[in-house]
C-alpha cells in the first residue's frame, strides 16, 4: 500500500504524483542530449525548467551530474540506469504509436499523460486526434508552457482534465472521443500509482470503449518481495540524503505494491485482446542500456511492456 495517497488526493505538476512527470521529462531531456539518443524530445527541457521542483532541474546541469559521479559511483550508475530506463520505455511506446498510425488508427488516448509530448513531437498522419487525460493543473501547465515558447501540436490535441478515479469515460466522450473507431491507448508510468482493483477497472473501461482493431500498450507495475523492497528503499534513501534529494526520490511512498495485482497480459488475453509482453530488462539489454549493479537479477521487480490488439 502507498502511505502518502488518499482516495481523493489531487496534485499539480510540482507535488505528489505530478512531480514524477517532471522526473520522467528530465530523463527524456538528458537522453535527447546524448550523441546517440534513442529518442528526441526537444520540449522536455522546457517542461522541466519551468516546473519548480528544484532537484530535477539540477539533474539537467552537467556539473551536478559530474559531482554525483565523482562522489558516489553507485549513485551515478543508478541515475544512469533510471535515465536509460525512461529512454528505453519512451522508445518502445513511440514505436507502438508509429505502428498504430501505420495501421490506420487515428484516435489516440494517453492516460495520465503528465508531461508526455508525443502530440507535439511524433510525426502523426493528417486526421489524428490525441486525447490526453490527467489532472487539470498538470495539463494546464504543459499546454501553457509549450504555448509560451510557440510550440504547437502536430496532431489535433484535446485535453481531458479529470482524475482517472472519476468518470473519465464520460469526460472523454464529451471531448469528442468516438468509441466506434479503433483507438490506440497508452498507460505508461500509471499502473503503479493505482491499487490492484483500480487497475482492473481501468482495463475494463478501456475494453468497453474499444472498437475492433483497437490497440493498447501498458507499462506494468513490478512487485518485489518485502526484503528486497526494503533493501532498495534503503539504497535510495541513502542516495537521496547524500545529494539533498529526499523529497524528490520518495516515490516508493506514492505507489501501490499490491501483491494480488493482475498480470496485465493475462488479463487482456482473457478479455478479448491478444497480448504480448516484453520484459524491460530484455529491452534495455537489447538496446545496450543496462547499467545497474550486478547484485540486481532478473528475479527483481522490473516492469514489462505490454501491447495488445482487440480483434473483435
Swiss-Prot record:
Documented EC number(s): 2.1.1.-
Any matching Pfam family: LCM
Disulfide bridge positions per record: none
Keywords on record: Methyltransferase, S-adenosyl-L-methionine, Transferase
GO BP term (any one): methylation
Gene3D superfamilies the record matches: Vaccinia Virus protein VP39
Residues noted as binding S-adenosyl-L-methionine in the record, renumbered to the chain: 134, 163-164
InterPro entries, per the entry: Ppm1/Ppm2/Tcmp, SAM-dependent_MTases_sf, SAM_mthyl_Trfase_ML2640-like
Entry's Gene Ontology molecular function annotations: methyltransferase activity
Described function: Exhibits S-adenosyl-L-methionine-dependent methyltransferase activity.
Family of this protein: Belongs to the UPF0677 family.
Protein name: Putative S-adenosyl-L-methionine-dependent methyltransferase Mjls_0078
The species this protein was found in: Mycobacterium sp. (strain JLS)
Amino acid at each position: 500500500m502507498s502511505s502518502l495517497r488518499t482516495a481523493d488526493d489531487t496534485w499539480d505538476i510540482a507535488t505528489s504524483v505530478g512531480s514524477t512527470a517532471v522526473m520522467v521529462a528530465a530523463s527524456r531531456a538528458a537522453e535527447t542530449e546524448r550523441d546517440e539518443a534513442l529518442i528526441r524530445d526537444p520540449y522536455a527541457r522546457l517542461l522541466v525548467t519551468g516546473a519548480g521542483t528544484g532537484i530535477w532541474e539540477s539533474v539537467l546541469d552537467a556539473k551536478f551530474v559530474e559531482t554525483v559521479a565523482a562522489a558516489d559511483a553507485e549513485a551515478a550508475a543508478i541515475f544512469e540506469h533510471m535515465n536509460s530506463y525512461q529512454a528505453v520505455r519512451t522508445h518502445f511506446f513511440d514505436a507502438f504509436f508509429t505502428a498504430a498510425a501505420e495501421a490506420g488508427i487515428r484516435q489516440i488516448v494517453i492516460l495520465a499523460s503528465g508531461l508526455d509530448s508525443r502530440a507535439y513531437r511524433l510525426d502523426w498522419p493528417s486526421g489524428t486526434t490525441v486525447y490526453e487525460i490527467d489532472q487539470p493543473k498538470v495539463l494546464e501547465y504543459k499546454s501553457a508552457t509549450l504555448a509560451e515558447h510557440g510550440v504547437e501540436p502536430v496532431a489535433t490535441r484535446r485535453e481531458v482534465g479529470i482524475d482517472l478515479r472519476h468518470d473519465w469515460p464520460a469526460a472523454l466522450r464529451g471531448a469528442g472521443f468516438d468509441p466506434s473507431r479503433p483507438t490506440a491507448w497508452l498507460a505508461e508510468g500509471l499502473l503503479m500509482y493505482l491499487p490492484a482493483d483500480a487497475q482492473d477497472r481501468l482495463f475494463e473501461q478501456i475494453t468497453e470503449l474499444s472498437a475492433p482493431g483497437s490497440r493498447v500498450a501498458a507499462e506494468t507495475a513490478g512487485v518485489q518481495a518485502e526484503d528486497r523492497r526494503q533493501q532498495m528503499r534503503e539504497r535510495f534513501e541513502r542516495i537521496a540524503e547524500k545529494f539533498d534529494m529526499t523529497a524528490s526520490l520518495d516515490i516508493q511512498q506514492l505507489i501501490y505494491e499490491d501483491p494480488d495485482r493482475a498480470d496485465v497480459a493475462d488479463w487482456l488475453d482473457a478479455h478479448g485482446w491478444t497480448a504480448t509482453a516484453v520484459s524491460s530488462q530484455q529491452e534495455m539489454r537489447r538496446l545496450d542500456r543496462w547499467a545497474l549493479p550486478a547484485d540486481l537479477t532478473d528475479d527483481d521487480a522490473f516492469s514489462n511492456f505490454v501491447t495488445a490488439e482487440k480483434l473483435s
